[in-house]
Design a protein with these regions (language model features):
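Regulatory, non-catalytic segments
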Residues: 115-130
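Basic nucleic-acid-binding alpha-helical/helix-turn surface characteristic of O6-alkylguanine DNA
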Residues: 1-114, 163
């Protein structure tokens, strides 16, 4: 779904929209043109929402995803604090099909770095836009959860919501 590009910046240049989901409260943060961060950490959420089209659309799509009505996100993404090479790892994550999981080793191989399972794990652990970049679909070689950036404490009780 297209996002309008008529944006009025707030003082910080960032916009946010939060919503209650099946995983708890989530906040989408945008630079006015791209989704840059997805946050569960309510500590420090003292500011009020200042939504824009991107943050609103992110919450709309996440809501549809959690209700089972959406399997692939269509959002403009620019992960906060990520170099181009780090973003390539995230782009590979988006190719993992809905409802499937792969190992860190398989993820590394898919990214063209078959001997870099630890780097694959780091890419998952430092993902600033979890769910949209589906790091929850990447597991340890033994099939167990690794260091998921959204917080591995979320996954055992909410695995069915994260496909």
């Amino acid at each position: 779904m297209p996002i309008t590009d008529t944006i009025i910046y707030n003082r910080s240049g960032l916009f946010s929209q939060r919503a209650q989901t099946s995983l708890g409260w989530i906040r989408a943060i945008s630079d006015g043109q791209h989704l840059t961060y997805l946050d569960w950490n309510q500590t420090g959420w003292t500011n009020h929402d200042q939504p824009d089209d991107v943050s609103r659309e992110t919450i709309t799509q996440l809501t549809a995803y959690f209700h089972g009505d959406l399997r692939r996100f269509d959002l403009p993404l620019l992960p906060a604090g990520m170099s181009q090479s780090r973003r390539r790892w995230l782009d590979v994550m988006t190719t993992i099909p809905f409802g499937t999981t792969i190992s860190y080793a398989a993820f590394a191989a898919a990214a063209g770095h078959p001997r870099a399972a630890r780097a694959a794990g780091t890419a998952c652990a430092t993902n600033p836009i979890p769910i949209i970049y589906p790091c929850h679909r990447v597991l340890r070689g033994d099939g167990q959860l690794g260091n998921y950036s959204g917080g591995s404490h979320l996954l055992p009780t909410h695995q069915d919501n994260l496909q």
